[in-house]
Amino acid sequence: MAHENVWYSHPRKFGKGSRQCRISGSHSGLIRKYGLNIDRQSFREKANDIGFYKYR
């Protein structure tokens, strides 16, 4: 079995490896609440466009 066939052959059905940010594709710092699936950095950039506002 060559290396090309083995690389990323393990199924990613659950866990952190199965989910990624819908904007940047990152796996770290994901916000899954309300079905957002956006990482922290992208959320801070796009929060106002989505409809999240700070009341301070």
From Swiss-Prot:
UniProt keyword annotations, A-Z: Ribonucleoprotein, Ribosomal protein
InterPro entries in the record: Ribosomal_uS14 (IPR001209), RIbosomal_uS14_euk_arc (IPR039744), Ribosomal_uS14_sf (IPR043140)
GO cellular component, one term: cytosolic small ribosomal subunit
BP term (GO), one: cytoplasmic translation
Domain of life: Eukaryota
Pfam families, alphabetized: Ribosomal_S14
Keyword Nucleotide-binding among UniProt keywords: no
Molecular-function annotations in GO: structural constituent of ribosome; zinc ion binding
Family: Belongs to the universal ribosomal protein uS14 family.
Protein name (Swiss-Prot/TrEMBL): Small ribosomal subunit protein uS14
